[in-house]
Amino acid sequence: MSGSETRKATVGGDQFDVYTGNANPELARNICRYLNIDLGRADVFEFANENIFVRIIDNAREKDVFLIQPTSRPVNQSIMELLIMIDAFKRASAGRITAVVPYYGYGRSDKKDQPRVPITARLIADMLTVAGANRLLTVDLHQGQIQGFFNIPVDELTAVHLLSGHFLQKRIENLVVVTDLGFAKRARTFAELMDAPLAIVEKRRIGNQDRTEVLNVIGDVRGKRAIIVDDEIDTAGTLIQIVNALQREGVTEMYACATHAVLSQGAVERIDESLLREVVVTDSIPTSAEKRGHKIKVISLAPLIAEAIVRIHRGQSVGALLTSEVHFTQEMLLWDVDSPPDRTPGEGDDGRPAATGGLVPTPRAIDVSGR
């Protein structure tokens, strides 16, 4: 996108602005649409020599700035865009800069599991901090300990309430939730929300390639319907291995969900040709209609991230968004992108600035699947 489609963003008397790079402008627009605000104006583009240029059009002095930019494909360009945007806002005297990174690229490179290899997830954290970010807002990191790589505050949201809410509407009976050890903690929350038992798939990674081997299924799955839960779907090779293993164990019907739809080459075809009934992902990474195939459904993180932005700006707790205590996480599933609420920007039902948990009268999740 040459010159990001951006406009000034404020809520009532609150002085905070939301801007976007080119990684996922549609998510940024949906966040602002949920908040009933305009998107901040900035030009973010690439010269013919592949140098990235950022020019902020609005006055950012002393503003609380939120930059929406998942570090997804093209990963390295998205990272550089974000770093340059942060630098531009720092030099424009922004009061605080929050990098909103729904998908954290290089998240798998979080440890030295072989000799003479980098910890790139830590390097990216250092780069964001040195560039001038004051805070990070992200969703379902590959490993939670990545938060410890930062010397600035990190708020990690989770999509498990949105994803489980989708399946709760289906009223699937005789259900088991299946995951691997790496996502077991979040999957436990998902299983509790679904009121279903949890089964674990034991697997191991082979070499440096995106290849894994499924070794065993731990738990009673025979004769049940299964939802496979993970943080991301990349090549879908591991997902299909799990599907095949569950079929051998006697599972009768299978679904899958993940926060991040990386969907590398061949993934959609593998999913379409599999025994999976449906695969549900979020829009942390843009997923065009042609990349969804016949079985992939996309629900939006926009309401969740929007609520977190307002809470961060107002100094309120973000932790409440990680629990089932916040009722709007279920109501979000009904938010229709084609008929957003008619609301004066930043006002609640009584005409005052909206409080978190009720920014619009019936906050509902945006379904960007096109279905």
What are the roles of these predicted feature ranges?
Residues 1-371:
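PRPP-associated nucleotide enzymes
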